[in-house]
Design a protein with these regions (language model features):
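Conserved beta-loop-beta/alpha segment of the NTase-like Rossmann-fold superfamily
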Residues: 91-169, 173
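Short, structured coil segments at secondary-structure junctions
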Residues: 58, 78-81, 189-191
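Conserved beta-strand segments of alpha/beta enzyme cores
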Residues: 83, 149, 192-194
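N-terminal glycine-rich phosphate-binding loop and ensuing alpha1 helix
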Residues: 12-71
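Acidic helix N-cap motif at the loop->helix transition within catalytic regions
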Residues: 71-78
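Conserved alpha/beta core of the MobA/IspD/sugar-nucleotide pyrophosphorylase nucleotidyltransferase superfamily
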Residues: 3-13, 17, 173, 177-215
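Conserved donor nucleotide-binding strand/loop of the catalytic core
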Residues: 81-92
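Short beta-strand segments
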Residues: 18-22, 65, 120-121, 152-155, ...
């Protein structure tokens, strides 16, 4: 089920950002993704919406995966013009959101075989614009040479891999076979990735608790 202003979108070698916003957020103590925060002296936005706003300039489409009954968050996404997709299986973990997003693309894009997937976590609002730009640029260069491409950022300081992660559509079947809360980790472990070195601590900074919010 989806709430979309556009269907049958024409896709030609496109990237769709799938913003995973249907998590339970139990450690936060309240409606985490609807909680408003301020970044860089900008007006306050719902935490879950910021990732979608940040990635939007660098991809072709953005879809936001939500719990069916999370009306407050849906309203926030709609206000900013984003498509929302209901994840009926949200209690089954992160992988269920990825699968809901891919199925939406399969059902609504005229050429889904030309569409690739950037997996974004809605609780990671501190990723910088330059990081989104770098990973998309690297992906577009690599996909011309290697159909089986996975791109993710790696932090300069400690060489830890972060988000977002872009999967070419050659991994679509494997993504649809994921289960549990590990997301695409099993695919990354099996196939490896091309890394983009970034000086951006935001690629590792998810918000699990209120104390994770930068003041």
């Amino acid at each position: 089920m989806s709430d979309s202003e556009s269907s049958n979108i024409t896709s030609t070698n496109t990237i769709t950002a799938i913003v995973l916003a249907s998590g339970l957020g139990t450690r936060f103590g309240g409606q985490k993704l609807s909680h408003e925060i301020v970044i860089n002296h900008n007006p306050p936005f719902a935490l879950g919406v910021i990732s979608a706003l940040n990635v939007k300039p660098f991809v072709d489409h953005v879809i936001c995966i939500v719990q069916p009954e999370d009306k407050a968050l849906k309203q926030q996404f709609k206000f900013h013009g984003f498509t929302t997709v209901d994840n009926l299986d949200f209690e089954q973990g992160l992988s269920s959101s990825i699968k809901a997003g891919i199925r939406f693309c399969q059902d609504n894009y005229k050429n889904p075989s030309n569409n690739h997937y950037m997996i974004c976590l809605a609780d990671m609002p501190y990723i910088e614009a330059d990081t989104y730009k770098a990973v998309t640029k690297q992906f577009k260069a690599r996909i011309k040479i290697h159909a089986n491409t996975i791109i993710r950022p790696v932090l300069t300081d400690n060489k830890k891999a972060g988000h977002p992660v872009i999967f070419s559509n050659k991994f679509e079947t494997e993504l649809l076979n994921l289960s549990g809360d590990d997301g695409g980790k099993p695919i990354v472990k099996q196939h490896g990735v091309d890394s983009v070195i970034v000086d951006d601590a935001g690629v590792l900074a998810d918000i699990d608790r209120k104390t994770d919010i930068r003041l």
